[in-house]
Amino acid sequence: MDPCECSKSGTCNCGGSCTCTNCSCTSCKKSCCPCCPSGCTKCASGCVCKGKTCDTSCCQ
């Protein structure tokens, strides 16, 4: 699992709207921000986004 620490790979802005910039990981744990492609619905807190697409298989 790629922890995708945005502080190392890009910039992470947390708040009402979470955004990751320059994040190139392919699978991300949602600790602060998800790194799924733009347009993806954010997973509930604690969920893990896998791969490059978000759908029903994204959250577990």
Swiss-Prot record:
Residues that, per the record, bind a divalent metal cation 6: 36, 40, 43, 59
Recorded GO MF terms: metal ion binding
Region described as Beta: 1-28
Binding-site positions, a divalent metal cation 5: 33, 35-36, 49
Disulfide bonds: none
Binding positions for a divalent metal cation 4 per the UniProt entry: 32-33, 43, 47
Protein keywords: Metal-binding, Metal-thiolate cluster
Family per similarity comment: Belongs to the metallothionein superfamily. Type 1 family.
Domain notes: Class I metallothioneins contain 2 metal-binding domains: four divalent ions are chelated within cluster A of the alpha domain and are coordinated via cysteinyl thiolate bridges to 11 cysteine ligands. Cluster B, the corresponding region within the beta domain, can ligate three divalent ions to 9 cysteines.
Function: Metallothioneins have a high content of cysteine residues that bind various heavy metals.
Name this protein carries in UniProt: Metallothionein B
Annotated organism of origin: Notothenia neglecta (Yellowbelly rockcod)
Lineage: Eukaryota, Metazoa, Chordata, Craniata, Vertebrata
Gene that specifies this protein: mtb
